[in-house]
Amino acid sequence: XISSSTPPYDLNRFK
């Protein structure tokens, strides 16, 4: 997300 700073952390939110 959008709340996350950078991938792959952003991808983990979709999980």
Swiss-Prot record:
Domain of life: Eukaryota
Tissue expression summary: Starchy endosperm.
Protein name: Unknown endosperm protein E-15/E-16/E-17
Lineage: Eukaryota, Viridiplantae, Streptophyta, Embryophyta, Tracheophyta
